[in-house]
UniProtKB/Swiss-Prot annotation:
SMART domains: RRM. Phosphorylated. This is RNA binding protein fox-1 homolog 3. Signal peptide: none annotated. Keywords: Cytoplasm, Methylation, mRNA processing, mRNA splicing, Nucleus, RNA-binding. Residues 99-175 form the RRM domain. InterPro entries: Fox-1_C_dom (IPR025670), FOX1_RRM (IPR034237), Nucleotide-bd_a/b_plait_sf (IPR012677), RBD_domain_sf (IPR035979), RBFOX1-3 (IPR017325), RBFOX1-like (IPR047131), RRM_dom (IPR000504). Residues 1-29 have a biased composition (Pro residues). GO terms for biological process: mRNA processing; nervous system development; regulation of alternative mRNA splicing, via spliceosome; RNA splicing. It is found in: Nucleus; Cytoplasm. PANTHER family: ATAXIN 2-BINDING PROTEIN 1-RELATED, RNA BINDING PROTEIN FOX-1 HOMOLOG 3. GO terms for molecular function: DNA binding; RNA binding. Residues 1-105 are annotated as: Disordered.
Length: 374
């Protein structure tokens, strides 16, 4: 009875570049048959009889394996040879590239010819550069060789040598690293002041629309000026300016009292002002200006807007706008407290000390700029 053939098995696709005809055959079920003539190992295939099938000989795989091996080894050799051929021509190219060396701790009297003479014995030098500042040499420089092989040889020979009592160091120069630039000046007009002092003395403070003094033109003229000494030049310019016209938001007499009087503090009592029938003169020394019945009238101080009208003007205007008659029934202050009579401390508080502009500026700087070194 004939044995049925096993199902046909096709060889797998070629792998690793090995042709399909040299791939090992698929495994077959091994059966033991007697009376069959063994096939010589040199044959690469198994002979089948019509009645019986012969098992696959062990020598078949052995005969096919060397064939596959003999095909792969030359391919690996060819690939290695190709890689070597690609690497060897590139080595001379790399050696021909220029290379830069960093030389540090050189004597301060060294100049470019001295450094060129020191390194010139090792090969052709393309460039020599010693770094200087305003005081002279900084003690290091750069030497650029035409070939990297000469640069490596110079680095090996000269690194650590003693030159005029100084041990020089020669290393490969690294790529230049661009450090972050310093942040730009926050003031567009070039003022280099801290925020507190810049707020007090900066021209922008006097150029805002809420400031009642017409100093915009003066501020624009001084815009961009690099100041010294706390911006005193521009500050003195504002002080030397003629007295400004009356504040638009307050009455003329009230403006003179607020601006040309000492700084009114919260505890000061209101000074009654006499009614004025004639137009207000430009200066208090005019004969047409009626005398004030206020104890402060003898002390006339021209206050800047920062210390007088702008900061304390709101509260002072409120206090001075109260009725001048002492028989007022009741009045309230800015905190909502209602008083049935005049301020009980009206006659106990005398005139405050008059501070000059420089003293007030010093007080402001000392109080709010405690971290300023001077």
């Amino acid at each position: 009875m004939a044995q049925p053939y096993p199902p046909a098995q096709y060889p797998p696709p070629p792998q690793n570049g090995i042709p399909a005809e040299y791939a090992p055959p698929p495994p077959h079920p091994t059966q033991d048959y007697s009376g069959q003539t063994p096939v010589p190992p040199e044959h690469g295939m198994t002979l089948y009889t019509p009645a019986q099938t012969h098992p696959e000989q062990p020598g078949t795989e052995a005969s096919t394996q060397p064939i596959a091996g003999t095909q792969t080894v030359p391919q690996a050799d060819e690939a290695a040879q190709t890689d070597n051929q690609q690497l060897h021509p590139s080595d001379p190219t790399e050696k021909q590239q220029p290379k830069r060396l960093h030389v540090s701790n050189i004597p301060f009297r060294f100049r470019d010819p001295d450094l060129r003479q020191m390194f010139g014995q090792f090969g052709k030098i393309l460039d020599v550069e010693i770094i200087f500042n305003e005081r002279g040499s900084k003690g290091f420089g750069f030497v650029t060789f035409e070939t990297s092989s000469d640069a490596d040889r110079a680095r090996e020979k000269l690194n650590g040598t003693i030159v005029e009592g100084r041990k020089i160091e020669v290393n490969n120069a690294t790529a230049r690293v661009m450090t972050n630039k310093k942040p730009g000046n926050p003031y567009a007009n070039g003022w280099k002041l801290n925020p507190v002092v810049g707020t007090v003395y900066g021209p922008e403070f006097y150029a805002v629309t809420s400031f009642p003094y017409p100093t915009t033109g003066t501020a624009v003229a001084y815009r961009g000026a690099h100041l010294r000494g706390r911006g005193r030049a521009v500050y003195n310019t504002f002080r030397a300016a003629p007295p400004p016209p009356p504040i638009p938001t307050y009455g003329a007499a009230l403006e003179q009292t607020l601006v040309k009087m000492p700084v009114p503090w919260a505890g000061l009592a209101p000074c009654p002002l006499p009614p004025q029938q004639t137009p207000e003169p430009a200066y208090p020394t005019s004969p047409a200006f009626p005398p004030l019945s206020c104890p402060f009238a003898s002390r006339v101080v021209y206050q800047d807007g920062f210390y007088g009208a702008e900061i304390y003007g709101g509260y002072a205007a409120y206090r001075y706008a109260q009725p001048a008659a002492a028989t007022a029934a009741a009045y309230s202050d800015s905190y909502g407290r209602v008083y049935a009579a005049a301020d009980p401390y009206h006659h106990t508080i005398g005139p405050t000390a008059t501070y000059s502009i420089g003293t007030m500026a010093s007080l402001c700087r000392g109080g709010y700029s405690r971290f300023t070194p001077y």
